[in-house]
Amino acid sequence: MSQVYNFSAGPAMLPTQVLKQMQDELLEYGNTKASVMEISHRDPYFIAMAQKLEQDLRDLMGIPNHYKVLFLQGGASAQFSMVPINLLQGKTKANYAHTGHWSKKAITEGKRYCEVNICTDSSDNKYTDIDVFENWNIDPDGAYLHYTPNETIAGLEFDYVPEVDMPLVADMSSSILSREVDVSKYGVIYASAQKNIGIAGLTIVIVRENLMGNVLANQPVLFDYTTQANNDSMYNTPSTYSWYAASRVFEWLKQQGGLSAMAKINQTKAKTLYDAINGSDFYSNPVAIKYRSWMNVPFLLADESLNGFFLEKAIANNLITLKGHRSVGGMRASIYNAMPQDGINELVNFMKVFEKENT
């Protein structure tokens, strides 16, 4: 099979090395005489893998000891509910930054539990820019500030971390593990797995211990961070294969040199693609340069009537899943950790040829 580069926004491309390892181990995990999908989550082999999974993530991200790491289900969407359930703690207000599709969904769910103060809003500029933090309208009575560091659909990414005197909550689904992060600045970090962590079915939550133990009354027991922490994220049967896939991705990340090395790789990949877009009158990106995403790169063709032909030719050249989200249009290249520089080079070369042949 020839090399195919998958630019899907999620579920996304996995490292080839990880896929091959998963293939090799599919029928028998370790000496269990069974697939990892078939063994109990209480099996000593699985428990050992789960413990290493957490330790590898702690090592990669430098997670302090006074933070719990939870491996949950329900996607980031479940966290839109779990965050207010766990963090309101007697307060009736929370601050949310509205910078795109996913932060809007978090806001909608947050309103079910409290009064939401939208402290900054990028909808007026169609999610192409972010206001400087000095202009934000933070309600000091809010229980927390929630923001989305990288908006997958618009390709809009913060280049700063908001500094507030309240717990900071971040939906890092599409940026986690792409660079180093100072976890101590956050009260809660959460991320669904199907972009930079592994496969769908797993959501990672990193929560500071002093924010646990005071949930809203009459809520599902599974939505209590303390319940999950006290049961090692196994109050119910976990998504075992998703845990396993993440364990293999974490090992791969360590082999690449960790997150400082990945940051350099990701910066180079993004620069290669943005340089090609910026140097062309045929392609464009609407996002303010300062806030362009490393992970998700939308680009528009000057002649929209060529969109379908572009996608058809791209697939023929083994460049797949480049269609942009319907709210933005055009194309979108999602270039998470697993996308190698060679994939970016192939895309850029194709874009140049396509431009030459269609102008």
Curated annotation (Swiss-Prot):
Q: Which GO terms describe its molecular function?
A: O-phospho-L-serine:2-oxoglutarate aminotransferase activity; pyridoxal phosphate binding
Quote the cofactor binding remark: Binds 1 pyridoxal phosphate per subunit.
Q: Where does pyridoxal 5'-phosphate bind?
A: A76, S77, W102, T152, D171, Q194, N236, T237
Query: What's a GO biological-process term for it?
Result: L-serine biosynthetic process
Q: Which principal EC class is assigned to this enzyme?
A: transferase
Q: What is its main location?
A: cytoplasm
Q: What domain of life?
A: Bacteria
* Pathway(s) where this gene product acts: Amino-acid biosynthesis; L-serine biosynthesis; L-serine from 3-phospho-D-glycerate: step 2/3; Cofactor biosynthesis; pyridoxine 5'-phosphate biosynthesis; pyridoxine 5'-phosphate from D-erythrose 4-phosphate: step 3/5
Q: Which reaction does it catalyse?
A: O-phospho-L-serine + 2-oxoglutarate = 3-phosphooxypyruvate + L-glutamate; 4-(phosphooxy)-L-threonine + 2-oxoglutarate = (R)-3-hydroxy-2-oxo-4-phosphooxybutanoate + L-glutamate
User: Subcellular localization, per the record?
Assistant: Cytoplasm
Tell me the cofactors it needs. Answer: pyridoxal 5'-phosphate
- Relate the assembly described in the record: Homodimer.
Q: What is this protein called in UniProt? A: Phosphoserine aminotransferase
Organism, by scientific name, is: Ruthia magnifica subsp. Calyptogena magnifica
Q: What lineage is on file?
A: Bacteria, Pseudomonadati, Pseudomonadota, Gammaproteobacteria, Candidatus Pseudothioglobaceae
